[in-house]
Amino acid sequence: MRNLSIYAGPKARALIARQGLTPDMVEVVAGAAGGPKWLVLDGLDRAIFTSWLMQRSGPVFLLGSSVGTWRFAALAQGMDAHDRFRDAYLGQRFTSVPTAAQASAEIMKFLDAALEGGGPVRILSHPHARLTFLAVRCPGPYAVERKYPLFMLMAAAGLLNAAHRSLLSLLFSRVLFYDPRDLPPYHAMGGFPIRRVPLTPENVRPAVMASGSMPVIMSGVRDIPGAGPGMYRDAGILDYHLAVPFAGSKIVLFPHYTDRITPGWFDKLLPWRKPSVEDMANVVLLCPSKAFVASMPGGRIPSREDFWEFKGRDDERTAFWNHVLRASASLGEEFLEAVDRGTIGEHLEPIEPLCR
């Protein structure tokens, strides 16, 4: 494979060595935070969700964080909703640096595009997809919306995290939103205080928004129905790349934009922070190869920094994003070829070097 790299945990490798990889072997699909980086996964999303995964006979759990939640809220309805979300996302325009409220209003436009015409009901009635996702509940001081006080509070959280990741439990708690038709295998995940909230047609929209409401950049979401009073913010604070105990005995398919798995947002500058092999044992990580990334304009994929790099040149930014999006089709093609031919086992690399 030239464009796609595949890493697999020890249990996943053993399963694939015996059986290959079929849709019914996949129990969970994971979607990480990361802003516009998700655009490089469009080809994989199309391959997995349009033709391959929907051949399965039972439910599949979609676990999202931040923009991964937004992707899955669209994909859990079908490709029409995904295309509306993608097109609205590509259409973002900012004439100046937006306030948090302005950024939230703009982002709500493309979430509304994905959820229009009864999206929450479609999500909760999909025959196979079971949408689940994370958010973070913030205590009193972290509910403030004034930019500079919140920035200083988040900086203090970063210092606590640098000392030990577990110290973030003093400040934040996880919230797991889930489709109540089936409990996900990670329903009992530990590591941080957790609140589990069943999804309803009434809370899908604010909960999905909260999962990607990045502090300082966007406003938080208050008092989500069913979740209790409080301020809810971006899941990536605790679960940036979903280095979580997935549990279960089947495959966790993880289309990802990089071969690095960063546990929390504050860990981005701490390269020694990695997931455990135990938590990644069932994971099959699909990501663009280094050769693919090098072949993109500037030798990189889209990122949030593009809003600053292309400030005042939205058409150039959109052209770059569209180039990567179109090129990503090759990732999906290589994945489908490997699973259809039964050769995916030949392309697996151990995930252990990516772990601690």
Predicted regions and their residues:
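Patatin-like phospholipase
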Residues: 1-61, 74-356
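Catalytic nucleophile serine of serine hydrolases
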Residues: 66
